[in-house]
Amino acid sequence: MRAREIQRNWQHLGKRGILFLGILIICSAANNLWVTVYYGVPVWKEATTTLFCASDAKAYETEVHNVWATHACVPTDPNPQEVVLENVTENFNMWKNNMVEQMHTDIISLWDESLKPCVKLTPLCVTLTCTNVTNNRTNANKNDTNINATVTSTDEIKNCSFNITTELKDKKKRVSALFYKLDIVQIKQSEINQSESEDRLINCNTSTVTQACPKVSFEPIPIHYCAPAGFAILKCNNNTCNGTGPCTNVSTVQCTHGIKPVVSTQLLLNGSLAEEEIIIRSEDITKNTKNIIVQLNEAVEINCTRPSNNTRKSIHIGPGRAFYATGDIIGDIRQAHCNISGGQWNKTVNQVKKELGKHFNKTIIFQPSSGGDPQVTRHIFNCRGEFSYCDTTDTVDDTEEEEDTTITIPCRIKQIINMWQKVGQAIYAPPTAGNITCRSNITGMILTRDGGNDNNTRTEETFRPGGGDMRDNWRSELYKYKVVQIEPLGIAPTRARRRVVQREKRAVGIGALFLGFLGAAGSTMGAASITLTVQARQLLSGIVQQQNNLLRAIEAQQQMLQLTVWGIKQLRARVLAVERYLRDQQLLGIWGCSGKLICTTNVPWNSSWSNKSQSEIWENMTWMQWEKEISNHTSTIYRLIEESQIQQEKNEQDLLALDKWASLWNWFDISNWLWYIKIFIMIVGGLIGLRIVFTVLSVVNRVRQGYSPLSFQTLTPSPRGPDRPEGIEEGGGEQDKDRSVRLVSGFLALAWDDLRNLCLFSYRHLRDLVLIATRILDRGLKGSWEALKYLWNLILYWGQEIKNSAINLLNTTAIAVAEGTDRIIEIVYRAFRALLHIPRRIRQGFERLLL
């Protein structure tokens, strides 16, 4: 009884243990995390890509071709979308912004492109005979807003005559034109007439000059830079953003605001304004070598004019080429100038000094430029095709201007301008007929700070207007933008696991994963199938590389195809969008996630990648924070997902190979039973027919041998001998051993007897065949074994013989060598003894002679 009680307790304990073990397994399985792929996550990283332009070019004058080629840009979006990113902090750096470099390169390319079809002024590098243009007028008061001042004859313009080639290259003619004094250099003074001199164009010994086409306009048109698909532009909306550091108010846009490509120095014109206070921006404000960009919060209007009523004439300098020059000046020769409201400018300068004082805690002093290149020491800008060089000394002095006063900035016009983007290349701006007036807004300044060794002891800091690097102009507008690349593929741990075919994972040779795209061409089909993933990836890389090569070819043929830089950028942007999409879809396809936004995998999550719990990840972290945490392990996770998918595909392929055995279960389908019965009846009928045929043939054979056929109804006993009596009634005696033929009656009995005899016949013959085959196989194996034993003994015998022969040969050789060595030693010894005894033999010979 006690044994039975213990047995019952163990049974209950076993059931409870199994239940507890099952719960433990379920709980442990529930705590396992698996890698899950997400497509479309809000993750980005800093990138450098090709931007394209958008512009409302059709809204401007259509008769002229603007140098910015905005007609090749896409139209602007009438309803631009801007999405504010909540709880996002992003770092910006305007001094290391590729958008600035890209815009700088684009503007250079646009200037070059606009000048390609224009006339080269190399034939003008001849001796110019120049005289001063005389015009006796008086200068106006500085405070007069309607300036009618004129310059003296030696100030600005000279009338020059020179020889030039006509339409016929072997003919020359003398022509004259007016040149600004800044555009010519005196060669020598005339000895006869002091007012006459020999001059040349200023560029003839340094650079080539291209005349701007007369239909080209330099009027700045707003350009919107746009990011291609797969990329985005982040915008910092902090009102006090200084262009560097973290920004907490971030939004994403597809295009920037309209940026006017104004080429100017010292003063920034027609840009954007600060929303609150004046912003001071510098890469390192403690270094005096770094420029300081000042963004104003209120625009200051500046009105510039060239009051002289000039006329323009065309001078033919060869077949199909014309040079446009100033023909005459109608009326007074008055100086170009700009007017600024004194009170407004004085207020702005004081605010700038106040902001600079916050950074240096010293007295701020503004001084004029200390000298250098005219493009830096003067405020340069373009007004309706005329390039003006203005002296800004009066704008930085410390005199307090009254509210109603006007600051007049004198300007000088140059027609030959050294292009700010290239060395050894200049542009000739054709004169513009009539009066010229431009109204602009000063929205910023570019300053430089004086250096020195006594910075710590000085109580003043001196700032001067600067510029010259057009990148600073573009930075003043692009400081709040940065380009990022959207990474829509994200990975995170979840408890969901992909249901796959469970098979033992086989090792894959690591060398196969590094084969080239065509490296598996000579491998077997099975070996090449392992590298399909690598081939797909390298095929896409080849497509991308080919597209880049094609674009480089198009860019090289830009002049032939008449493509502007915007056309190239649009081609790049479109191809780049396709490449980005194909790459993402290729990765999803390799991972077995095509067409899925959320895709589970069979890769277990490794705690070394991140040991945070699932709740900490999904409830407390953003996708950007999560991506930064696992960024060092992303490539490893991608590789494991890829290997898992490859193994799954192999398992599925093996499973498909086993599907043919699944059709065996269909044999038991009731719908197939009638077909089975029909086949059975056909087989039985065939066997019966064969039996009948064989029976008829047997009867015919016996009849031919002289026997009569047996009766189908009578059983005839076999005859007995006289010495073999039948058995007695008591059952004694020997039983009869003669067989009697059993007669059957009925069709089924006959069929069953025939089938039984046929099966026995087949069994006996198959048994005999198997026995014969077994006997033959046994004899063959025994013979093979005997042959192998004989061959092995033969090998051992001949091996021993060869060994003995080698030993004998070695012994014989050793003996021969030893005997030869002994003989050689003996001969050498005897020769040595003979040589040694020569003096003795000589002495003995002398002794015999003496005796």
From Swiss-Prot:
Gene3D superfamilies per record: 1.10.287.210, Human immunodeficiency virus 1, Gp160, envelope glycoprotein (2.170.40.20), Single helix bin (1.20.5.490)
Gene that this polypeptide is encoded by: env
Start and end residues of each stretch annotated as CD4-binding loop: 369-379
CDD domains: HIV-1-like_HR1-HR2
Any Gene Ontology CC annotation: viral envelope
Sections of the chain in a coiled coil: 628-662
Region annotation (V1) ranges: 130-159
Motif (Di-leucine internalization motif) on chain: 850-851
Entry PTM: Highly glycosylated by host. The high number of glycan on the protein is reffered to as 'glycan shield' because it contributes to hide protein sequence from adaptive immune system. Palmitoylation of the transmembrane protein and of Env polyprotein (prior to its proteolytic cleavage) is essential for their association with host cell membrane lipid rafts. Palmitoylation is therefore required for envelope trafficking to classical lipid rafts, but not for viral replication.
Keyword Glycoprotein: yes
Extracellular topological domain: 32-679
Region (Disordered): 449-469, 713-737
Position of the signal peptide: 1-31
V4: region residues: 390-411
Species of origin: Human immunodeficiency virus type 1 group M subtype K (isolate 97ZR-EQTB11)
Site entry: Cleavage: 506-507
Pfam families on file: GP120, GP41
InterPro entries to which the protein is assigned, alphabetical: Gp120_core_sf, Gp160, GP41-like, HIV1_Gp120
Region of interest (V3), residue spans: 304-337
Region annotated V2, chain positions: 160-204
Keyword check for Disulfide bond: yes
Compositionally biased intervals (Basic and acidic residues): 457-469
Family as reported in the entry's similarity comment: Belongs to the HIV-1 env protein family.
Organismal lineage: Viruses, Riboviria, Pararnavirae, Artverviricota, Revtraviricetes
Region (V5): 454-466, 456-466
Domain comment quoted from the record: Some of the most genetically diverse regions of the viral genome are present in Env. They are called variable regions 1 through 5 (V1 through V5). Coreceptor usage of gp120 is determined mainly by the primary structure of the third variable region (V3) in the outer domain of gp120. The sequence of V3 determines which coreceptor, CCR5 and/or CXCR4 (corresponding to R5/macrophage, X4/T cell and R5X4/T cell and macrophage tropism), is used to trigger the fusion potential of the Env complex, and hence which cells the virus can infect. Binding to CCR5 involves a region adjacent in addition to V3.
Protein's recorded name: Envelope glycoprotein gp160
